[in-house]
Each structure stands twice: as C-alpha cells, then as structure tokens.
C-alpha cells in the first residue's frame, strides 16, 4: 500500500517500522528529525546515498513527555512536549544531541497537560521569538489560558504571553515565507453534527479571538455559551479557509522551495488525519490551499490521497492503513509525509521532463 499522487509525481517509502511517526523537521543539510510521542523521543534519519530512502537512523533525544513540535534555529533543535520547550545543542553531521536538553520555558507555561496534547512550535522569521500552539483540555467549555491559545515567547523561552485565543485545538502552525504572516490550522468542536463546526485555517493576529467556546465562523453563537460572553462573540474572527468538519487538520506547510510548479510556490499544504466520529468519514489526505498575493483564496483541492481502504463517502467507519500527520520539505524539495497507524514516512517527488 502507498499513497496516491497525481501522474506528474512519484511516491516512495522514505522510512518505515517507526515507533510513532508524527511530526517532522528538516535541517538545511538534509537531516530529518521525527517526533515520536508515544516513545518519548526524537529520531534522526539520514539519506546518505541520495536514493530517497533513509539508510541511517539514530535516537537524537529521549526521555521526553509526548514530544511533538520541532524547529531548528542556529545550532539548536527546539522540541515542544507537554512540559514545555526544550533546546538541544546540535551541529550538522551529528547523529545525536551534543548535550542534555534544557527546558527554556518556565514550569506551567502550557497549562495543565490533559486533553489535546500536541504542542507545536514555529520560530519567527527574525529569529527573535517562537510561537507554540496549545489545544484545549476538552471538547467545549470555558478554560483558563493558555489552553486553546497560541502563545508567543522570546527565543530564550522567557516573556511568554497569549498571542491569539479562542482556538479550540490549533495544531499546524507556520509563517508564510513571503509575508511573514503566522497561520494555524484548527480542529474545531464536536457534538453539533457532521456539518458543524468546520475545521479551518486562519491568519493569526496579535490579540485576536477566534470563537471557541462562545461562537464559530464569526459571530455564530454556540448554544449554552454565547450569552456568557457576548463581547467575545462579536469579536470572533472569520477563518480564511473552511475545511470539511471533522477532517482533523494537522501539519501546515508552505510550498516555497519544493518540487512543485511555479504557480504553487505561494501555496500551502495541509495534512488531514481524518475523522473519528463522523457518520460519513472525512479527511485522510493532503490538500493544497492556493494563495494569491500572499493570501489564501479560500478553497482547497486534493493532492495526496489513498490512505483509505474503503470507498470515500460511504456511511461506515473508515478503514485506513495510514493517517497523514506531519510534513516537511526535504533538502531536494521533495515532500515528506509522516503517517501514523502504519508509522512510516513517505516521500513525494516530481517526475522529470
């Protein structure tokens, strides 16, 4: 079994037999970092002979508490887990961290650890700050910050503050490479049927509020909560792109520098891990979100599919062999996709002329 890609692309297995393939980051020198939360570790993979498949594998760091977010900056690898952000010294060519990791965020910086557990990190283009996406503890309810927020920190881990709020479960988080705008993709609330509430992609602004738990898609009131904070209902931002409800968007990756057509270089890709409770299963694919002049056009289309064993659209529990979660561009511009369930990394490359 393998993902299905358009005819002008090819797919090959980059790595398999992993413990828990979730999140990816790639160094400029080509080393691939993989967060494996259930194993509490970060794995380093290298394709030393350039054949498109990892032939070297080592444990970069271990003993972490559900590590998920990964970022590289200077001579350090940043890892976000349930306890905070850890910084590890590293140099290209090294197969392990050069020393013990240091937790640079203060205790309790992410709130309690229950509920949505992914903590993903993006470093600002100027290298002065990093941002962490922190999901809610429950499906819907009033929860104290920093749950359901994106927090900003100085690059040394100090100065943490809420940057944007009302985000039920923000997972993928990334800066647009040209505009510098910070975007996230959000898993919205359950319990309102198959058609509500759409998951979404949104540009984040400092101090902005995005609805949860009082409203959704702008000032549409959430029953049982809207009357508690009518001021926040009115402040709720409308997302830039709405995804099919319960698609479970995970990684957000911009295409610039990848093996894609010139008119795709401004676009984004989003990994849909797929629904778990929808009557008609949805997701289980990678989609392309077109941009124009640095802004999303508001629609999306399939790019990588084939993770389902049954026919899409049927009212049945989905049978899947893989759920796409993490994405990164390899040094050669190919697209790497980490899929849990089968715990493999797939490589998508463009065919030559």
Report the location of each language-model feature.
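Short coil/turn segments that connect the beta-strands within blades of beta-propeller domains
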Residues: 29-30, 74-75, 126-128, 180, ...
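Asp-box/WD-like beta-propeller blade repeats and closely related beta-sheet repeat scaffolds
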Residues: 56-57, 66, 71-73, 83-125, ...
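Blade-loop segments of beta-propeller domains
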Residues: 42-75
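Surface loop/turn motifs at the tips and blade-to-blade linkers of beta-strand repeat domains
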Residues: 13-18, 58-64, 104-113, 162-166, ...
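Beta-strand-rich domains and repeat architectures in extracellular enzymes and scaffolds
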Residues: 3, 10-38, 247-254, 270-271
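Beta-propeller domain segments
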Residues: 1-7, 118, 136-139, 148, ...
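Residue-level marker for isolated small/hydroxyl-bearing positions within beta-strands
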Residues: 27, 35, 80-82, 88, ...
């Amino acid at each position: 079994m393998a993902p299905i890609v358009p005819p002008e692309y090819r797919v090959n297995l980059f790595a398999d037999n992993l413990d828990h393939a979730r999140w990816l980051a790639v160094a400029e020198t080509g080393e691939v970092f993989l967060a494996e939360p259930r194993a509490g570790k970060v794995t380093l993979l290298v394709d030393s002979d350039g054949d498109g498949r990892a032939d070297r594998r080592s444990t970069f760091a271990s003993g972490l508490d559900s590590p998920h977010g990964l970022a590289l900056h200077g001579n350090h690898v940043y890892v976000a887990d349930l306890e905070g952000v850890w910084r590890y010294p590293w140099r290209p060519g090294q197969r392990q961290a050069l020393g013990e990791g240091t937790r640079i965020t203060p205790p309790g910086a992410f709130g309690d650890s229950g509920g949505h557990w992914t903590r993903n990190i993006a470093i600002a283009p100027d290298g002065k700050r990093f941002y962490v996406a922190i999901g809610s503890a429950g499906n819907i309810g009033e929860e104290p910050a920093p749950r359901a927020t994106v927090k900003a920190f100085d690059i040394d881990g100090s100065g943490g503050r809420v940057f944007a709020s009302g985000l039920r479960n923000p997972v993928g988080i990334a800066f647009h490479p040209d505009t510098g705008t910070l975007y996230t993709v959000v898993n919205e609330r359950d319990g309102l049927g198959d058609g509500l509430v759409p998951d979404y992609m949104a540009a984040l602004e400092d101090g902005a509020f995005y609805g949860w738990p009082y409203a959704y898609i702008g000032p549409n009131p959430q029953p049982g909560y809207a009357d508690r904070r009518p001021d926040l209902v009115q402040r709720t931002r409308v997302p830039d792109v709405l995804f099919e409800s319960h698609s479970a968007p995970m990684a957000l990756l911009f295409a610039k520098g990848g093996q894609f057509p010139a008119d795709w270089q401004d676009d984004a890709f989003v990994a849909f891990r797929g629904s778990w409770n929808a009557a008609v299963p949805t997701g289980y694919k990678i989609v392309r979100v077109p941009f124009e002049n640095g802004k999303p056009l508001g629609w999306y289309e399939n790019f990588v599919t084939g993770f389902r064993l049954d026919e899409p659209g049927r009212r049945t529990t989905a049978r899947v062999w893989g759920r796409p979660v993490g994405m990164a561009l390899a040094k050669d511009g190919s697209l790497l996709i980490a899929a849990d369930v089968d715990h493999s990394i797939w490589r998508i490359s463009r065919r030559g002329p």
